């Protein structure tokens, strides 16, 4: 694989978190202090391409090729937000946390769109809102996705009419919180699905830093999600004082 191809893979993976946050799930909740608004916000602006903060080596696996990439803004203007159907649409577009994983092709290989679709269906994902795949709560699709899966190639969707021609260096999985179940339970649904898809596609599971997902990182994510659940659980009811 050429250096240019590896650079492109790194750029796409680095920018995908922002793609998912804006393209798939709307806008994050506003902080209590609000945010600073630039003068030119809301106006047409010049396209800004991702940049590379360090050089890539000529060898290494998918994780190593993605090292050293600095996340930057991708242009999503003009994308159709109504693609696909309503299956997997979040009831509320606000979110406050995203947990992501990737399945990347091994060095010198790509993931074929047709294979991705077959494996997604085998692992219980359904095609729906935004033309991407979702894991839904069984019997309650109206509650929205437990997690979603998209291609890292812009715009992230799967064009079923041309799926046989589609190739992508990686696919991304997003657990967007709050979810229709506890954060930890949602993670326990997503992780084995990602691992199984990686096995069937002969790919590599990467974490949100584009490193190979290991036990220590999994344990750390579980701890983070336990803390999130504690923070967002309903406060206990106080007992009425005896008179």
Swiss-Prot record:
Cytoplasmic face of the membrane: 26-243
Subcellular compartments: Cell inner membrane
Keyword terms, alphabetized: Cell cycle, Cell division, Cell inner membrane, Cell membrane, Membrane, Transmembrane, Transmembrane helix
A single Gene Ontology CC term: cell division site
Lipid bilayer topology: Single-pass type I membrane protein
Periplasmic side: 1-4
Membrane-traversing stretches: 5-25
Gene Ontology biological process terms, A to Z: division septum assembly; FtsZ-dependent cytokinesis
Pfam families the UniProt entry points to: ZipA_C
InterPro entries for the chain: Cell_div_ZipA, ZipA_FtsZ-bd_C, ZipA_FtsZ-bd_C_sf
Subunit structure: Interacts with FtsZ via their C-terminal domains.
Family: Belongs to the ZipA family.
Role: Essential cell division protein that stabilizes the FtsZ protofilaments by cross-linking them and that serves as a cytoplasmic membrane anchor for the Z ring. Also required for the recruitment to the septal ring of downstream cell division proteins.
Protein name as annotated: Cell division protein ZipA
Taxonomy of the source species: Bacteria, Pseudomonadati, Pseudomonadota, Gammaproteobacteria, Lysobacterales
Encoding gene per record: zipA
């Amino acid at each position: 694989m050429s250096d240019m191809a590896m650079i492109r893979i790194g750029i796409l993976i680095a920018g995908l978190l922002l793609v998912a946050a804006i393209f798939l799930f709307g806008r994050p909740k506003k902080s209590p202090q609000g945010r600073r608004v630039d003068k030119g916000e809301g106006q047409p602006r010049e396209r800004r391409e991702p940049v590379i903060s360090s050089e890539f080596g000529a060898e290494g696996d998918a994780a190593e090729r993605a090292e050293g990439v600095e996340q930057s803004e991708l242009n999503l203007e003009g994308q159709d937000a109504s693609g696909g159907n309503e299956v997997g649409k979040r009831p509320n577009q606000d979110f406050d946390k995203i947990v992501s994983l990737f399945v990347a092709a091994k060095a010198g290989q790509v993931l074929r769109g047709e294979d991705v679709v077959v494996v997604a269906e085998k692992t219980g994902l359904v095609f729906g809102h935004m033309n991407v795949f979702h894991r839904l709560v069984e019997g309650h699709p109206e509650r929205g996705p437990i997690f979603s899966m998209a291609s890292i190639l812009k715009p992230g969707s799967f064009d079923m009419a041309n799926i046989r021609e589609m190739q992508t260096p990686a696919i991304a999985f997003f657990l967007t919180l709050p979810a229709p179940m506890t954060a930890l339970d949602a993670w326990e649904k997503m992780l084995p699905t990602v691992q199984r898809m990686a096995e069937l596609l002969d790919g590599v599971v990467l974490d949100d830093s584009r490193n190979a997902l290991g036990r220590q990182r999994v344990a750390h994510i579980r701890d983070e999600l336990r803390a999130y659940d504690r923070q967002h659980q309903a406060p206990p009811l106080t007992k009425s004082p005896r008179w």
